[in-house]
From Swiss-Prot:
Family, per entry: Belongs to the UPF0473 family.
HAMAP family: UPF0473
Record-annotated membrane-spanning stretches: none
Organism: Listeria welshimeri serovar 6b (strain ATCC 35897 / DSM 20650 / CCUG 15529 / CIP 8149 / NCTC 11857 / SLCC 5334 / V8)
Protein name stated in the entry: UPF0473 protein lwe1514
InterPro entries named among the record's database cross-references: UPF0473
């Protein structure tokens, strides 16, 4: 099921996702990237407002952005191969963050 997401350039790292009950929830974007192997764009994000010492669940979706770059559709990750690639990229990202 595709979910709508909005992007406000004043809050560049926040997306708003409408859940199944129709309620909007804020998520912070960890990072996004394009995959040539799967010809898709992906975004990794987590619930906004979590403190640094709380354990967070990082979510991943592929997405299709609208022409203006302000709104789009999140799509579920479809294959194990995509998940493997996302997990590898996330591990590299987290390792790089630890080094800084």
């Amino acid at each position: 099921m595709a979910e709508e997401h909005n992007h406000n350039h004043e809050e560049e790292n926040i997306i708003w996702i409408t859940n199944e009950e129709g309620k909007e929830e804020a998520f912070e974007i960890l990072f996004d990237f394009d995959s040539e192997d799967f010809d898709k764009s992906y975004v990794l994000y987590f619930p906004a407002g979590k403190s640094e010492d709380e354990e967070i669940e990082i979510l991943a979706s592929s997405y299709i952005q609208d022409e203006e770059g302000k709104q789009g559709q999140l799509k579920p990750v479809e294959t194990d191969e995509e998940w493997d690639m996302i997990e590898e990229i996330l591990a590299t990202f987290l390792a790089d963050e630890d080094e800084e």
